[in-house]
């Protein structure tokens, strides 16, 4: 009940002036570190997210370039073998080996095996028989790793290739017969990437008679393994990363061995 002193003034009760207990004070003090810790963690997460958002395009671009570099290494090995064949025999190999009746037998890839260090495998082929004859088909699983892209996971398992020649009028491989490396002007494309669809010994390249296109169709369009660009290699064994939206005139000029076009490929070079 209320308590008054001798002068009639209300005196506060003991209960109303009671200090907080030690346990209450401890709990109150314990909230502060927790709040500060939560604020610090939230800030760090926000900063980390911002850094990742800024850096991620560079990271993904690095992954893409590394993937393309692996393809270009494969293509350089193949180009070296093609050039060695040209130096030995005077021209590049025919895209398709034909029998006496004009029947397609097998691909140029079989012919360059000795120049890739695979002479033993080459000697196992029955060169008078087609690629899908029982004896030759049994060698499909001996495909050199350079013929398949690591960026096309099913290629190695199906023994299908990702690297092809460009054939047809105005190329290094016209219908009249293959040219030699000495007949090609600088920056002439020798080999390009494509989505796989044919076995490595099977005759199969991209004929540009209907026009050269960048796209996703296997063995028809150039490219398909990489986003935004495709890989190619020249007769000089220079690796190129060519944008998918390259002007058609530039693409056509890169294919022509003797067109006289002056094409700046400095931004494409590996």
Which residue ranges define each predicted feature?
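Hydrophobic alpha-helical interface faces used for helix-helix packing
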Residues: 167-270
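Short clusters of hydrophobic/aromatic residues that line enzyme substrate/ligand-binding pockets
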Residues: 92-93, 125, 131, 163, ...
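Solvent-exposed loop/turn segments at secondary-structure junctions
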Residues: 153-156, 195-197
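Short, solvent-exposed loop/turn segments at the edges of secondary structure
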Residues: 80, 107-108, 142-144, 158-160, ...
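Conserved hydrophobic/amphipathic alpha-helical signal-anchor segments
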Residues: 49-142, 146, 152-155, 182-186, ...
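N-terminal intrinsically disordered, acidic low-complexity segments at the extreme N-terminus
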Residues: 1-24
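N-terminal Sec-pathway targeting helices
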Residues: 25-47
């Amino acid at each position: 009940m209320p308590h008054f002193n001798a002068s009639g003034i209300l005196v506060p009760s003991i209960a109303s002036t009671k200090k907080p207990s030690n346990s209450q004070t401890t709990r109150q003090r314990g909230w502060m570190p927790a709040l500060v810790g939560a604020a610090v963690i939230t800030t760090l997460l926000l900063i980390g997210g911002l850094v990742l958002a800024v850096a991620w395009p560079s990271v993904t671009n690095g992954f893409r370039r590394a993937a393309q570099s692996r393809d270009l290494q494969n293509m350089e090995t193949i180009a070296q073998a093609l050039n060695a064949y040209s130096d030995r025999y005077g021209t590049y190999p025919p895209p398709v080996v034909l029998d006496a009746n004009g029947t397609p037998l097998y691909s140029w890839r079989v012919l360059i095996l000795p120049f890739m260090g695979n002479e033993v495998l080459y000697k196992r082929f029955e060169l008078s028989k087609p690629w899908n004859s029982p004896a030759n088909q049994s060698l499909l699983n001996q495909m050199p790793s350079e013929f398949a892209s690591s960026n096309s996971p099913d290629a190695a398992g199906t023994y299908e290739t990702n690297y092809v020649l460009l054939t047809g009028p105005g190329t290094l491989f016209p219908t009249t017969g293959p040219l030699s490396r000495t007949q090609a002007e600088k920056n002439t494309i020798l080999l390009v990437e494509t989505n796989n669809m044919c076995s490595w010994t099977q005759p199969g390249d991209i004929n540009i008679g209907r026009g050269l296109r960048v796209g996703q169709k296997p063995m028809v369009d150039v490219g398909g393994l990489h986003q935004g660009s495709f890989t190619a290699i020249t007769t000089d064994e220079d690796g190129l990363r060519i944008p998918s939206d390259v002007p058609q005139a530039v693409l056509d000029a890169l294919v022509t061995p003797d067109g006289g076009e002056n094409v700046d490929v400095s931004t494409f070079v590996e």
